[in-house]
Amino acid sequence: MIMDTNAVSFRARDEVTTQLAPGTGGQAVPTSNGMMTRFAMSESSLTDLLHKAATQYPNRAAYKFIDYDVNPDGFTETLTWWQIYRRAKIVAEELRGYGASGDRVAVLAPQGLEYIIAFLGVLEAGLIAVPLPVPQFGIHDERISAALQDSTPSVILTTSPVIDEVTKYAPHARAGQGGTPIVVAVDLLDLDSARELDLTPPAHSSTAYLQYTSGSTRSPAGVVLSHKNVITNCVQLMSDYLGETEKVPSTAVSWLPFYHDMGLMLGIILPMINQDTAVLLNPMAFLQRPARWMQLMGKFRGQISCAPNFGFELAVRRTSDEDMAGLDLGHVRGIGSGAERVNPATLQRFIDRFAPFNLRDTAIRPSYGLAEATVFVATAEPGRPPRSVNFDYQSLSVGRVERCANEADDGAKLVSYGSSWTSEVRIVDPEARTECPAGTVGEIWVQGDNVAMGYWRNPQLTERTFDAKLTDPSPGTSIGPWLRTGDLGVMFEGELFITGRIKDLLIVDGSNHYPDDIESTIQEITGGRVVAIAVPDADGEKLVTIVEFASWGHSGQEAIDKLRSVKREITSAISRAHRVRVADVVLVATGSIPVTTSGKVRRSSCAERYRNDGFTRLDRSA
C-alpha cells in the first residue's frame, strides 16, 4: 500500500491514531476543550469550512468512529482534519471523471468514516450530494428507489462490502433518463495516495445536497439545501442552544444515521463549523446497547448530542449504574430531543436517571425543526430546565389551550420550545392565512435563511409549501414568503408549544383529537410503540389504536387474561383522559408497526394495513 506522507495512520491498542502532518514540526496542537472558537460566518460554503479546519488544525481529531462489530468494547478509528480533507479531495478527483456541474451523487454506505469521506468528496467535486441509507441485504427498499429515481444521480458512492446490493438499485436511478449511474466503492480508491493533489477550492453550485424527507405521509421528497442554508442553520442552532456565538462545544457524540437530517448535521457538518471532534457510532450499536451513548458522552467528554424521544427512553431503561461507573456528565452542555414528539415524562426520567452522574437538567433541550428548514427551528432559552404545561384536552379539541385545573388532572402535557429564536416563527390560521391570537392553535410558519429553496423538481409542491403569504400581517411581520410546516402549534404565556401534525389530526365523533396525545396515554401503560388512527365507518370515522406489546412469558389462558386486562386498561384510560371511545385496540408483537427510516410511525401505511386486516393480532382470541 502507498502511504500518504501528509497523514500516516497506524493501529495501536484498538485505536487508529495519526501522525502529524508534515510542516507542523511536531508541534503540539492545543485541544479545543474550553477554548474560544468563533463561528466562521465569512465562509460561504461547506468546502471552505473543511479547508479552513484542515489548514488551521491539521492534526486535530475530526471524526472518531467507534466500531462495536469489530470489538464489543469498541474499536476506535480516527481521522484528523488533514486526513479527511485529503481523502475527500481524492474522492472528488474520481468523481470529476463521471459528473459535471449540477450533477447529483448518491451516497449509500454503512455508517462509518467512509460515508463521511464520500459525502465530503461530493462537495469537494462541486457536485450535489444525496445522502441515503444503505439497503438491507435481500430486502428491496421502495423509498431508496423513489429517492434515486427522483434525484437521478450520475454516480452512486458506496463501500465494497455492500456494493453488490447497492448496484441492484442503479438501473432504477435514471429510469427514462438514459444511462445507468456509475457505482464506486470509496474504500477501494487509493485514499492514502502520496500524489500531489489540486487543493484549489472547488467551484460549486449554490446547492450542497438534497435531503430526502422520511415520508411518513407521502413519497419522499428531496429538499434542496444550499451551502448558505446549512451554515446559517448551524450558527442558529449553536446560538439558540448556548446563547452565544463564541464558546462552542468541543465534542459532539452521535449515534444518529448520517442520511437523517439531524444525524448529518450533528455528526458531519457541525464539527466543521466548530472545527472540533465528533465521536460517532452505528445506530444499531446504540439499539443493541443504549448505555453506549452515555458512556461515550462521559468517556470523550462530549458536550453536545441529540436524539429522538425513544433514544432517551432506551437510555433510561437500559443503562445501569455499573455501565456508568467512574464516568462524569458534568461537562455536557446540550442534548437535544427532537425528530419526534417530545414526552416530558421521558425527559424527567432521563434527568433523574443521570443526575447522580452530574448531568444538569439545563442540558436537556427539547428542539423543534424539520428538513425544509435544514433541520433546526426552535428551542427554549439556554440555562433553564425543560418546562411543560398540562393542557385541558377538551379545550385542545376545539383549537384552544387552557391549563388543567391542577397538575394531577388528565391532560395533554406539552413541552415548551421557548419564546426567542433566530428563525422567524408565526402561528397561522391555515385557511384564512392570518396570524392566530395567543392561546389559539394554528399552523407553524417559519421564515429565515435556513429555509430551503424548495423541493427537487417539484414546483407545485414547492409553491404550496415554501411560498405562503400572510393576509394582513401584524406590524414587523413580512407578508412572505413563509414556509408552511404542516405542524400545529400555539403560543401560550409567550412560549411555543407543538400540538401535532395537520395531516395526523383525528376527527372522531365531531371532535379533534391529537394522535400523539392518545399514544402518550397508551405508552404510559405498555411502554412500547403505539399508533392511533382514524378509520372510516358507516357513521364517519372511528378511533383505532395499534399497540406493540412485548412478550411477557405467559401462555394459554393466563396469556388471554393478560391481553384482555391490557385492552380494558387502555380503553378505560383513553375514555377517561380524552373522552373518546376506542372502536378497536389491536395488540401486536414488537416490530409490527411500519416506520420510516428515521423511526417515525407511518400512519397511512398502518391505516391501510388495518383496513386490509394485515396485522397479526396477539389479541385475536382475547
From Swiss-Prot:
It comes from the Bacteria. Keywords: ATP-binding, Fatty acid metabolism, Ligase, Lipid metabolism, Nucleotide-binding. One of its GO terms (biological process) is fatty acid biosynthetic process. Pathway: Lipid metabolism; fatty acid biosynthesis. Its EC number is 6.2.1.51. The keyword Nucleotidyltransferase does not apply. Transmembrane segments: none annotated. GO terms for molecular function: adenylyltransferase activity; ATP binding; ligase activity. Disruption phenotype: Deletion of the gene leads to selective loss of phenolic glycolipids (PGL). Pfam families: AMP-binding, AMP-dom_DIP2-like. Catalyzes the activation of long-chain fatty acids as acyl-adenylates (acyl-AMP), which are then transferred to the multifunctional polyketide synthase PpsA for further chain extension. Involved in the biosynthesis of phenolphthiocerol, which is an important intermediate in the biosynthesis of phenolic glycolipid (PGL), also called mycosid B. Belongs to the ATP-dependent AMP-binding enzyme family. This is 4-hydroxyphenylalkanoate adenylyltransferase. It comes from Mycobacterium marinum (strain ATCC BAA-535 / M). The lineage of its organism: Bacteria, Bacillati, Actinomycetota, Actinomycetes, Mycobacteriales.
